[in-house]
Amino acid sequence: MKQLTGAQIRQMFLDFFQEKGHAVEPSASLVPHEDPSLLWINSGVATLKKYFDGRVIPQNPRITNAQKSIRTNDIENVGKTARHHTFFEMLGNFSIGDYFKEEAITWAWEFLTSDKWIGFDKELLSVTIHPEDEEAFTIWNEKMGVPKERIIRLEENFWDIGEGPSGPNTEIFYDRGEAYGNDFSDPELYPGGENERYLEVWNLVFSQFNHNPDGSYTPLPKKNIDTGMGLERMTSIVQDVPTNFDTDLFMPMIGATETISGEKYRNGDLEKDMAFKVIADHIRTVTFAVGDGALPSNEGRGYVLRRLLRRAVRYSKKLNINRPFMFELVPVVGEVMKDFYPEVLEKKDFIAKVVKNEEERFHETLHDGEAILAEVIAKAKEEKTTVISGVDAFRLYDTYGFPIELTEEYAEEAGMTVDHEGFENEMEKQRERARAARQDVDSMQVQGGVLGEVKVASEFVGYGTVATESNVVALVKNGEYTDSLQVGEEGQLMLDVTPFYAESGGQIADRGYLLADGVKVLVKDVQKAPNGQNLHQVVVEEGTLTKDAAVKAIIDTKNRSSVVKNHTATHLLHQALKDVLGTHVNQAGSLVTSERLRFDFSHFGQVQADELEKIERIVNEKIWESIDVEISQKAIEEAKEMGAMALFGEKYGDVVRVVQVGDYSLELCGGCHVDNTASIGIFKIVAESGIGAGTRRIEAVTGKSAYELMNDQVGLLKEAAGKMKTNPKDILTRVDGLFAEVKQLQKENESLAAKLSNIEAGNLTDSVMTVDGVNVLAAKVNVADMNNLRTMMDDLKNKLESAVVVLASVNDDKVNILAGVTKDLISQGYHAGKLVKEVASRCGGGGGGRPDMAQAGGKNPAQVEEALAFVQEYVKSVSK
C-alpha cells in the first residue's frame, strides 16, 4: 500500500473519476444558502439533489465531488470513539441516469486495488450486499474475483427513506488485521459488524426502484448511482493508524494543542487524549462553518457553533488551558486544508477573530458557572436525587452561557441527568416574558375575542393600488362582534379588498382613511389576523360605521412613499454590507418606517468608519444609477436557483415574491418597494452599534429625512463657525488652533501646579512627626487630581529621604488618597499598599498597590481627617 497524505487521497479520487468521464463538482458551502430550512450540508449527495430529482439537468450525467459536511447528531460521542466527527469530507461518484451497477463496482475495485491508485491488497477486502441482489453478487464474484465467502449478504443493505427512489447497496470493507480483533467467538467480528477490525471503506447505492405510496416497489425508468467514501476513515487505513484522529488531517491541530498546553497526546491518559480529539474535531468544524458564513448565536446553526466552541473550551481545561486559545488553531486548519480549500487561509483573520470573541465571552462566565454547577450537583447529592432541575440548568444557560448539552455532559460525569422538560419550560417562560415586554407588538391584541373565528376572505391589493372600493366584512369592538362603531369609538375590521399593508417583514403598516357618505374612519394600524386576513385598527372620526358598509379605502400615500424608499434601501444596504464586510453578513432583523430604517445583521466587531463610508457610498451609487426594481412571482426552487437571498428560519410557500434591483440585489420579500432606485433620492447612515454578541445594527434615513438631517448638520457647522469667528470651510484649522492653545495652557497649568506643589511640599515638611523612630507625614492637601498628588509625593520622599507619607485631597466630594514608603523602610515591613487600603476603608473607599507607592479612593470627605489619624497607629503596629 502506498504512503499517501489525506490531501493526496482526495485528489487521487477526483483524478480517477475525472479520467472515467466525470465532471468534478466543487465542494458547496456548508451553509445551504439556497435552502434556509436545512441547517447544514450533511452529505456528498445533499448538494446534488437538484440533479437527482430532475429540477436541473446536469451538463454531464457523471459527477464526482469531495464535499465538506457537518453532522451534529452525535456530538457527545466525538472524542470518545475512533471515528465520530462533526466535520468530515465525503468523496463520491454519481451517475444521473447514465452508468449503473457494473461500472460502479468495477471502478470502485480498480481505484482501491490498482497499483496506479490506492493499491490495497485484494485479499484484505470484503463486501456486503443485499440478500436478493444477485446482480451485485455476480459482478463481485465472477468479474471482480471476490470469493463468495468474502461476500456477505445483509438485510440492512437497502437504501430507503420512504416514498421515492430507493435501492440496494453494497459496502466495501478493509481488514486491518488481528491487532484490531482476533476473538472469533465475537458475534460482531465480521465485515458489517460492530468492530474495529473490518472498516467500511466505501458505500455504493444502486437507486433502481421507486418506493410507491402503497408500499410497493417498481423499477425506475432511469437508474442512478450514489456512492460515498469518508476521507478521514480512508486516510486512517492508508496511513495505518488506529483512529482517524491519528491521521495527518488531525495531528497538526493536536500537535499545536500539545505546544499550547504542555501536555502530550497518547501519553497514557485517556481523558486527556479525549480532550485533544474534541478540540481537533471542533476547531475544524467551527473554522469551516464560520468561513462559510455561519456565526455563533443562540439559535439554529449559530447555536451549534456556540455549543461546539464551548464544549472544546470545557475540555481544554483538562489540558490545563485556562485562556482563549482555539483561535490560534484556525491557521493550522487552514494549512492542513489549503490545497483544496484555500479560502480558509484567505479568511483566517476573520475566522480567528470570531472564535476568539466567542472564547473570551465564555471564559468570562465559565469559572462562575462551574462553581454554581458544582454547588447544584453537591446539593442534589445531599438531597439524594440524581436529577439536576430544569430551573438550575436554565440558570446555567441564561446567566453563564452553558448550553444545555454541556450541562448534561457535566451531569453525566457526576452520574446524574438533567430535567430537560423542566429546562424547556423555563425557556418558554422566558420567551413569554420577552413577548410581554414588546409593547409595540401585539398592541392590538390580535388574538383576542372572536378574531380567531373569523374566516371571511380578505384580498390585499396594495402592491399596485393606493385606493379601492371595499366592503366591511367583519367589525369587532372589545373582542366581540358589533354591528356599528360610533364617533370616537375604536374597533377592528376586515375589508373584502384592501390596499392597506399589514405590518410584516419589518415593514410597518399603512395608515389612511375609510370614507363613505357622512363617514370618515381613521386607519391607525394594520396587523395580520389569526387566520391571515389584514386586520385594520380604526377610530371613527365622523358618522357611524356599520358592518357591511361600502367604503373607499385610501392609504396615506405620503407615508407609503417614505416607507417604500426605506424598504428598498434596506435591500441595497444588505448587499452593500456583504460587499464590504464579507459574505458572512446575514440579516438578523429590520424595521422600516416612514421616518427611518433599522437593519440588524450578523458581524463581529464594530464596523469601522471607513467601512461605513464605503457602504454608504455604494448604496448611494446604486440610487444614482436609477436602477429599475423588478418584482415577480417565482416557484421557490426557481427563486433559489436564481440566487435569491432567503432568511434562515423564515417559512416560504411554493410560490414566492422576488424583489430584484437590477443585477445588484435579489431577495425574497413580501414588502412594498419603489419602482426605481432614483426615487430614494439619498441614503445617509445615522448610527452603527452593537445589540448583542455577533449582531450589529445600522440606522439610516433616506429622501426628505436624509436631506433634513444633513441640513441640520450644516446648520450646526455654520453656528459653530460663527461662534469661532471663522468660515465653515476654515473651521478645522480654527479647531486645531484652539487645541494647540489649550495644550499650551495645560502645560503652563501643570508647570504652575508643580511649583505650587513643591512649595506646599516644602511647607508640609514642618508637619513631619516621629513615631517610634520613623518619620511620618499624614496630611490633607489642596491639589486638583491624582497626578498632582503623585508629583507632591515624589517631592516629599526626596526631601525627607526616609519616611512614611500619606496624602489626601478632596475634589467634587471624592477623596483621592496616596501612600508612599521610602526604600529603607520597606525592608522593615512597611507597605504602602496595605497602608492605603486601611486608610481608604475609614472614609468609605478602597484601594491598594506596591510597597513603595499605592493609591486609593474614598466616598466620605468628612472622615478624611479621622482616616489620616490612623497612619500613626499603623506605624506603631509595624514597629512592634
Swiss-Prot record:
Q: Where in the cell is it found?
A: Cytoplasm
The residues that the entry says bind Zn(2+) are 567, 571, 669, 673
Specify whether Ligase is a keyword of the entry.
Answer: yes
- Give the residues annotated as coiled coil: none
Q: What is its main location?
A: cytoplasm
- Tell me a Gene Ontology molecular-function term this record carries: transferase activity
Q: Which reaction does it catalyse?
A: tRNA(Ala) + L-alanine + ATP = L-alanyl-tRNA(Ala) + AMP + diphosphate
This protein's UniProt keywords: Aminoacyl-tRNA synthetase, ATP-binding, Cytoplasm, Ligase, Metal-binding, Nucleotide-binding, Protein biosynthesis, RNA-binding, tRNA-binding, Zinc
Any one of the GO CC terms: cytosol
**Physiological role:** Catalyzes the attachment of alanine to tRNA(Ala) in a two-step reaction: alanine is first activated by ATP to form Ala-AMP and then transferred to the acceptor end of tRNA(Ala). Also edits incorrectly charged Ser-tRNA(Ala) and Gly-tRNA(Ala) via its editing domain.
| Domains as described in the record | Consists of three domains; the N-terminal catalytic domain, the editing domain and the C-terminal C-Ala domain. The editing domain removes incorrectly charged amino acids, while the C-Ala domain, along with tRNA(Ala), serves as a bridge to cooperatively bring together the editing and aminoacylation centers thus stimulating deacylation of misacylated tRNAs.
**Protein name according to UniProt:** Alanine--tRNA ligase
Tell me which species this is from. Answer: Bacillus thuringiensis (strain Al Hakam)
Q: Which gene encodes it?
A: alaS
